[in-house]
Amino acid sequence: MNDELKQVMAKAQEWLDGNYDEETKAQVRAMMEADDKTELIESFYRTLEFGTGGLRGIMGPGCNRMNKYIVAQATQGYANYLLKVQKENGYKNPVEQVSVVVGHDCRNNGRMFAETVAAVFSANGIKVYLFESLRPTPEVSFAIRHLGCQGGVNVTASHNPKEYNGYKAYWEDGSQVLMPHDAGIIAEVNKVKMEDVKWEANKDLIQIIGGEMDYDYMQAVKSVMIDQEAILRQKDLNIVYTPLHGAGRQIVPMCLRSWGFQNIHVVPEQMVIDGNFSTVVSPNPENAEAMTMGMNLGTKLNADLVVASDPDADRIAIVCRNDKNEWVIINGNQTNIMYHHYIINNMKKLGKLRPEHYVVKTIVTSELIRKIADREGVTLTDEYTGFKWIANRIREWEGTRKYIGGGEESFGFLPYDAVRDKCSPSAICLICEIAAWAKDHGMSLYEYLLSIYMEYGFQRETTINVVRPGKSGAEEIKQMMVNYREHPITEIAGSKVVKTKDFQLLKQRELKDGQWVESDIVMSLNATSNVLQYFTENGLKVSVRPSGTEPKIKFYFEIPADMPTPKDYDKATAEAEALVPAIKASLGI
């Protein structure tokens, strides 16, 4: 028996000897007695890390798995931190009692984990508003703000495979926790031993919420509407929606109806709450396969568009018909381009655009959005990947400027500030308004997108993932970033690099009149991130970002190409994609 297995067996024995339920002990015992110790090792070789985004892992017994004990331990640490901050009078407006919102999505064990979270919070004297059943992530964010709570938890693993569940921690503004509170919570969680957990729920402190909050949330979503007249004229827009078995199943159709849309169809098989996601290989709306049933129904009903939300209803997918009447999936960058263009231009036309308005994108999201904002004189800020950074920008500028929209290339968008996370109900309603407006002007949604390219120029966005598993892989990725910094790339696919950004050093270098000029990059909270960006003479942009959670390094390409007419879209796309091998070669991948 090697040293690792000895340590694993000792850790597993602690679970057999400890205060764990009999079912858990039986599962641990079976793993210990099995000839193949792989599952045992995977379950106990480390403790599931509470990171800056909370917890996420495969469900099962063991310290490296998502189960009620790990969830309770994390909640005890979070409760300790909330009470500590309150005691130190860290809030601007001290409250008599700390309160939190707790929600969950459709995943297996979600309700049990949410009730465990509520029990531990209440056992620590914290008031809990527990949703009666599954709800979208953005509604949890909304409820925290609406009820004046100091924090919250949503039990979800977003679009991960069915074996996973997770735990997202939120702060008083409805955003996922950010520095310094993320580090503070992590430190408290790491101090908690299982015997420190207070399990005995104080039921007087747990209040079930549901219908009234849904109504208030729907009213907030409705405030996003820009052109009600266009919707009224196109109220029969033919919409197919699928929640992919998740938390959008009730609220999204209700929101669409409240906006005035009357021709809404749902995919019945995927309206069933199902943590096994039985009708899809993966519940990730980025994957075309997940949209198959929606597209099939759309074909049958001759729909104008098909929209979907992921299991926790924060991200979206949009499918529309191209000029050949074929279904095409609109990627996350294209989605954000349409949102920003429509919001800025239509608010301007209707006299709603004001000087204090601003929009946000992440640093790896399309630069075409900057062109749109610049042309109309609207302030745009770049933030790090992850919606908590967009939420932080809203927090920093609250009271002085007004947020009107922001998003990231990974299929997330937020068109209002009543919520501080990605919001599929409002994003779906808004894309349907855009489709209605386009139809009102004799265009399909696809043709509207092409009209934006004709106005601002075409570019194709693509992402390359280079996977390097294991300890040696992590070292290789680290060395790749060192090499890029020590040996700067001067040319990509035959085009000279004229600007670079290093977000770890917060330095920008730009070629001006033949000389490199260095300047500082200003980011929220002066935070740094291990990201490099290159901009070339012909408008190419490359971003390099190691993943913080997976053994891979991501390369984001934005490739311009000529598109003289809308009919040249496919040709321009092919021309841009043909450059990818040359770009990869320049980067050594």
Annotate each language-model stretch with its function.
Residues 15-19, 23, 39-43, 47-48, ...:
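Gly/Ser/Thr-enriched, mixed-charge loops and adjacent short helices
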Residues 44-64, 157-160, 243-251, 255, ...:
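Conserved phosphate/anionic-ligand binding catalytic regions in large, soluble enzymes, centered on
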Residues 101-164, 262-318:
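N-terminal small/polar loop signature for handling phosphorylated ligands or for N-terminal nucleophile
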Residues 170-198, 333-357, 361-371:
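Glycine-rich phosphate-binding loop plus the immediately following alpha-helix
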Residues 299, 303-305, 326, 346-545, ...:
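Phosphate-binding and adjacent anionic-ligand microenvironments
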